Amino acid sequence: MLFNINRQEDDPFTQLINQSSANTQNQQAHQQESPYQFLQKVVSNEPKGKEEWVSPFRQDALANRQNNRAYGEDAKNRKFPTVSATSAYSKQQPKDLGYKNIPKNAKRAKDIRFPTYLTQNEERQYQLLTELELKEKHLKYLKKCQKITDLTKDEKDDTDTTTSSSTSTSSSSSSSSSSSSSSSSDEGDVTSTTTSEATEATADTATTTTTTTSTSTTSTSTTNAVENSADEATSVEEEHEDKVSESTSIGKGTADSAQINVAEPISSENGVLEPRTTDQSGGSKSGVVPTDEQKEEKSDVKKVNPPSGEEKKEVEAEGDAEEETEQSSAEESAERTSTPETSEPESEEDESPIDPSKAPKVPFQEPSRKERTGIFALWKSPTSSSTQKSKTAAPSNPVATPENPELIVKTKEHGYLSKAVYDKINYDEKIHQAWLADLRAKEKDKYDAKNKEYKEKLQDLQNQIDEIENSMKAMREETSEKIEVSKNRLVKKIIDVNAEHNNKKLMILKDTENMKNQKLQEKNEVLDKQTNVKSEIDDLNNEKTNVQKEFNDWTTNLSNLSQQLDAQIFKINQINLKQGKVQNEIDNLEKKKEDLVTQTEENKKLHEKNVQVLESVENKEYLPQINDIDNQISSLLNEVTIIKQENANEKTQLSAITKRLEDERRAHEEQLKLEAEERKRKEENLLEKQRQELEEQAHQAQLDHEQQITQVKQTYNDQLTELQDKLATEEKELEAVKRERTRLQAEKAIEEQTRQKNADEALKQEILSRQHKQAEGIHAAENHKIPNDRSQKNTSVLPKDDSLYEYHTEEDVMYA
């Protein structure tokens, strides 16, 4: 078995404190690579040798360890620690834990020394806890240096929401403490400060807490309530931490050694610390010279990452919840004290608010970015140094203290923001609203003046429009009379044109009526033909049904006759067969008759011979003949037997022949039946073909008839559309003729008017010249005193109407 002598200490708290993702990933990768590794690493304080892996079973290793008696015991204790750090045995010395001091019911190995590396672990953990306490107390101090006013809820809702806020703050405090512990554990692993430094840091925190409690008595009632609630929370947390530290302490000796190293706290008179604010450049600003403890505290505070904006909000919300849940009287006093604070800006509305740059503020330092150290650091942007200089040159706010806390306001629109900024925004908004009101008043005056000016201009324009309308009205009255005269003339022309148009229209209507009557007559003829064709179709259908009935009757009769014919044929065949048989029998009988006749004749001859034989018998001459006859009879009997056998054979042949003939008869009958069925099928097919041909002919006739009807309709529709198109074209032409006629009439009227006007002018000139001549003649007659001639001249010159002028009517002028 091999053991790795370079294995790290198997500390159970390292995984909880060092939450390093890289180590866990490496361990997981190592476990995946070798999950069943037999070689294990062992804890050892020995320096690294030449070989990484050493076996305790080798002779060299045993020879090197012979002088050290405690080697095996120490290795065993380091490898198998059986006592927990939180057990009751951790407060006792290892020498007191012998065989006699262990009770019987204790399930623990006997005479095993307490592992010494756990004491080092306890010291390291105690150092980390002290660092966490320092950071937590610093955060509480920063919390006291801030005061939050919640403007998102009313005063009536404050008492209702205390329980929910307390629960939320408790959960947020647990989460913040866990996050701070994790961050502090990481920092503790990196920095690894000594025990003496940790004790000095605890002394510094003790001095800071005493100074804050001594100075907090001079603050207002609201800050007292906040500090009391925070002190109570810290006391509870300190008690809990004391319990944890007592349970985690190893023994009396280690606890005493840890307490001895703690320095005595500095008195509150000498240890009053003014909090400092560090700029981004690293400089500190305070009114008091920092002491050594303050410097150490500053170094410890710098190690802690400053809380982000969200963590600050959570801390402030926790402070508010603790104030509401723990001290209701402190709430009332806080409300009384907060109301004058919030009413101060209202009473001092005319005064300018506090400058946000002069308001107290909790110092906050952003995490410093790592500077470039590689080759690219040579090409630093020039803007980075200028920005750093500008950041260092920026003025900072005064440091907030519990006596002079930073006032923060919580709003719905902007969340958490400084009260000075909030007052500044409200003050600027008020000034802006006043400026807007003044601007609106000035703009309204300008608008009213401009509106009045525009109204006057509009009134002048309206007066001009009225004058123009009056003049237009007078002109319309003058022109309306002229228009009336020309209108009357045009009306007469239009009446004549309409009369002519109506005459033509009547002619066209008569023509269309005649065409319509003709088309209707043609339509009626087509309908009559269609009805006749329908009657013919009905007759054909009736005839078809009758033919079908006759066909069915004929088919039934044919089938019956065919059956009767088959039966008669069968009977005839039977009769023929019987006749053939009878004829054969007759022939056979005739043959037999002839044979018998011949036999009788022969027998007669034989009888005569027999008589002669008898005579010879009597004469005893028959004996040789008898012998011959017997011989013949025996031969004949043999022949008879042969004939009988042949007859039997012929009978068997006859039965076979009859059977064959019967089979042939049946086959012939089947063939006759098949032929009859085939004949019937052919007749049916023929009739079906004839029926289909007749139906096709009827269908074709119907289609032809429908096609003729559709053609007639199509021709009718085409003719109708042609007539309509012709009518439309004629109407268009008529309309064009009308328009042309009206245009020509208008031109003619205009020409006639101009001609009439010229004629009127000429007539007027002629009348004037005639009157002038008449006046001259009358004047000459008067001068010559010839009354008779003058009377004659006057009677001849004067018109019939006894007037100086000749009047012509409008019709005479138009149709002259």
Curated annotation (Swiss-Prot):
The keyword Phosphoprotein applies. Pyrophosphorylated by 5-diphosphoinositol pentakisphosphate (5-IP7). Serine pyrophosphorylation is achieved by Mg(2+)-dependent, but enzyme independent transfer of a beta-phosphate from a inositol pyrophosphate to a pre-phosphorylated serine residue. Residues 18-32, 161-223, 327-342, 380-396 have a biased composition (Low complexity). The keyword Phosphoprotein applies. Keywords: Phosphoprotein. Residues 292-316, 770-792, 799-816 have a biased composition (Basic and acidic residues). The modification Phosphothreonine is found at T809. One of its GO terms (cellular component) is eisosome. One of its GO terms (biological process) is cellular response to glucose starvation. The modification Phosphoserine is found at S286, S343, S347. Present with 10300 molecules/cell in log phase SD medium. This is Uncharacterized protein YGR130C. The lineage of its organism: Eukaryota, Fungi, Dikarya, Ascomycota, Saccharomycotina.
